[in-house]
């Protein structure tokens, strides 16, 4: 909050006229000063800015929103939340009161404020005033260079550069030959020379002359390039360099004129430092970046998370002891935050006006406590407001203050508690209890989202399969019903065809039977006629027999016997021919039955082929296919 509220508070002080706080603020912001150097007679000495975190005197008012409801005994967070709060201009050091981390840092650096007792009669000590700068602002301008001088905030690396240059010069002395030194035409003994005289070297004079005529913005232009002055009339003399690549070239040159290049790097780097341009320290690679430290900063926090609520006592009873807020009442005042329990501190005089809200022992609980602490700080109801400019009453009701609890706070809370009545707590690592758990929660949420998406896809797939199954089941049901109807009709047709075939068989058998009966009747009639004819011939012969004539009798007997023989012979021929006819008939019947069986076989085969084509047409494929 200090970074946001500081400019606002400064504007208010300036508008109100001269105040001592303005002078202190100006002195606190003075991070750089210029002093004359004892070595070079007029060089600029760069002093790094140091942050001074100290409490200010800006005061703020807490405005309680008007409410038509009956006034309550305490003005809680609900009243200050929607109001126009001017107390947000408190000077708070660190990252601000918005998180527990900044509060822990502020509390650890303010031992005096924590060693006192938390009671309503405490008055904050006046802020410590820092002495003015020694000698004021030490401005000493040099002629001809003031218009190019700019003060920048950067680390003092001149000593490191000089040490590195000396080491490189020593190592280069072993590498350079006499020929190189002669060709350099350069006096290497420059320890007693000033910076100005080193710039007037015949190798560098023209280069630094053009460099001095440019401003810092022009020097840092990316399109501006130079030749290396140490490479004149030698290899690399035609190469162009920007400012920082030229400085890197002079630092890393390892062939001819090594010492001259190192001297150029030293003079150029020192000149850039004096003019306030950005310089890369010697030994670092051009284009290298530096980020935050690898080690994560950690600190101890109170566990379970707790928020101290101050100014919770109300009035004295008949025994001259203080009465205060109850547990449920305190929870109701902060019902928007997921606090689990509330406790109050009691002493010999009764309620001490100090209460605590206890949250869940998890990263979520710590975030809830930190959220309450941050919102109280935004409304100017935090630790600093309670310690420096507390307002016990606001709009006729008691104003509540709150902040994250520390070990010192809870020790004061337990000051008059013994045994089981003491509030138990532990000191845990912030990284271990909050950061790691939040990371684990984040990973679990990612896994949860992954499995949710996976489950959603599976549910969609299952729904599609279910719909497809319903459609296929309906088709199967209809197909089964159609097959049942077809089978029923086929069965009925088969029964009808069987009845017709049976009728045809019966008609056929009856017809054959009639034929056989007529045939048998004809054969019987034929035999009967043959017997009658024979009997007739025999009877006629017997009637014509005359006993008187033996010759005639013998003759008649011979005629009868010859007739009988002839008739028997004819009958034998008839029987033979009849048997031949029967055999021919049987053969014809066998041939006919054979043809009939073959026709039946062909019909069955054709029926199987037609049925197979029908099944293939309706999707019933063979497994071998």
Swiss-Prot record:
Residues 54-70 have a biased composition (Polar residues). It is found in: Cytoplasm, Perinuclear region; Cytoplasmic granule. Disruption phenotype: Early flowering and bolting at room temperature (22 degrees Celsius), lost sensitivity to heat and accumulation of FT, associated with reduced levels of TAS1-siRNAs. Attenuated immunity leading to an increased susceptibility to the pathogenic bacteria Pst DC3000 (avrRpt2), with slightly reduced induction of ICS1 and salicylic acid (SA) levels upon pathogen infection. One of its GO terms (cellular component) is perinuclear region of cytoplasm. The keyword Ligase does not apply. The keyword Cytoplasm applies. Residues 1-20, 30-148, 161-195 are annotated as: Disordered. Residues 452-533, 564-615 form a coiled coil. Residues 161-188 have a biased composition (Acidic residues). InterPro entries: SGS3, XS_domain, XS_domain_sf, Znf-XS_domain. One of its GO terms (molecular function) is RISC complex binding. Induction: Fades out in response to heat through an enhanced protein degradation (at protein level) triggered by the E3 ligase SGIP1-mediated ubiquitination. It comes from the Eukaryota. Gene3D superfamilies: XS domain (3.30.70.2890). Interacts with begomoviruses protein V2. Interacts with SGIP1 in cytoplasmic granules. Required for post-transcriptional gene silencing and natural virus resistance. May bind nucleic acids and is essential for the biogenesis of trans-acting siRNAs but is not required for silencing induced by IR-PTGS. Involved in the juvenile-to-adult transition regulation. In case of begomoviruses infection, it is targeted by the viral protein V2 leading to suppression of post-transcriptional gene silencing. This is Protein SUPPRESSOR OF GENE SILENCING 3.
């Amino acid at each position: 909050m200090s970074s946001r509220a500081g400019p606002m508070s400064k504007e208010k002080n300036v508008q109100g006229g001269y105040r001592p706080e303005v002078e202190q603020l100006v002195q606190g912001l003075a991070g750089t000063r210029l002093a004359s150097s004892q070595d070079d007679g007029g060089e600029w000495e760069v002093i790094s800015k140091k942050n001074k975190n100290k409490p200010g005197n800006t005061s703020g008012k807490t405005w309680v929103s008007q409410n038509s409801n009956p006034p309550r005994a305490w003005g809680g967070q609900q009243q200050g939340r929607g109001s126009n709060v001017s107390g947000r201009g408190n000077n708070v050091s660190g990252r601000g009161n918005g998180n527990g981390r900044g509060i822990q840092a502020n509390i650890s650096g303010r031992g005096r404020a924590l060693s006192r007792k938390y009671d309503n009669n405490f008055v904050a000590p006046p802020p410590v005033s820092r002495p003015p700068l020694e000698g004021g602002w030490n401005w000493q301008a040099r002629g001809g260079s003031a218009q190019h001088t700019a003060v920048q905030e950067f680390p003092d690396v001149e000593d490191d550069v000089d040490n590195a240059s000396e080491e490189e010069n020593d190592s280069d002395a072993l590498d350079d030959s006499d020929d190189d030194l002669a060709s350099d035409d350069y006096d290497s003994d420059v320890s007693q020379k000033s910076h100005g005289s080193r710039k007037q070297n015949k190798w560098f004079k023209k280069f630094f002359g053009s460099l001095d005529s440019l401003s810092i913005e022009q020097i840092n232009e990316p399109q501006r390039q130079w030749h290396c002055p140490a490479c004149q009339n030698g290899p690399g003399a035609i190469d162009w360099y920007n400012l920082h690549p030229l400085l890197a070239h002079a630092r890393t040159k390892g062939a001819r004129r090594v010492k001259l290049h190192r001297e150029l790097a030293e003079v150029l780097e020192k000149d850039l430092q004096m003019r306030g341009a950005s310089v890369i320290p010697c030994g670092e690679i051009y284009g290298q970046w530096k980020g935050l430290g690898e080690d994560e900063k950690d600190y101890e926090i109170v566990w379970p998370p707790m928020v101290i609520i101050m100014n919770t006592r109300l009035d004295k009873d008949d025994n001259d002891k203080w009465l205060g807020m109850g547990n449920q009442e305190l929870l109701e005042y902060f019902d928007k935050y997921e606090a689990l329990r509330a406790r109050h501190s009691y002493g010999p005089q009764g309620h001490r006006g100090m209460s605590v809200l206890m949250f869940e022992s998890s990263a979520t609980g710590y975030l809830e406590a930190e959220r309450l602490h941050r919102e109280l700080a935004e409304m100017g109801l935090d630790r600093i407001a309670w310690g420096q400019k507390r307002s016990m009453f606001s709009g006729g009701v008691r104003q509540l203050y709150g902040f994250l609890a520390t070990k010192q706070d809870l020790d004061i809370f337990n000051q008059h508690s013994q045994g089981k009545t003491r509030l138990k707590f532990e000191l845990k690592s912030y990284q271990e209890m909050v950061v790691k758990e939040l990371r684990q929660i984040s990973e679990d949420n990612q896994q949860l989202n992954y499995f949710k998406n996976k489950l959603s896809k599976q549910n969609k797939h299952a729904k599609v399969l279910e719909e497809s199954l319903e459609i296929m089941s309906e088709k199967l049901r209809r197909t089964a019903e159609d097959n049942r109807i077809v089978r029923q009709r086929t069965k009925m047709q088969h029964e009808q065809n069987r009845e017709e075939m049976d009728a045809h068989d019966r008609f056929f058998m009856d017809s054959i039977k009639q034929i056989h009966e007529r045939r048998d009747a004809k054969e019987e009639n034929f035999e009967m006629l043959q017997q009658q004819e024979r009997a007739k011939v025999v009877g006629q012969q017997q009637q014509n027999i005359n006993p008187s004539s033996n010759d005639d009798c013998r003759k008649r007997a011979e005629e009868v016997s010859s007739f009988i023989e002839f008739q028997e012979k004819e009958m034998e021929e008839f029987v033979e021919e009849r048997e031949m006819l029967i055999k021919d008939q049987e053969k014809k019947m066998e041939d006919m039955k054979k043809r009939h069986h073959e026709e039946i076989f062909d019909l069955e085969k054709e029926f199987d082929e037609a049925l197979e084509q029908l099944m293939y047409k309706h999707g019933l494929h063979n497994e071998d296919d």
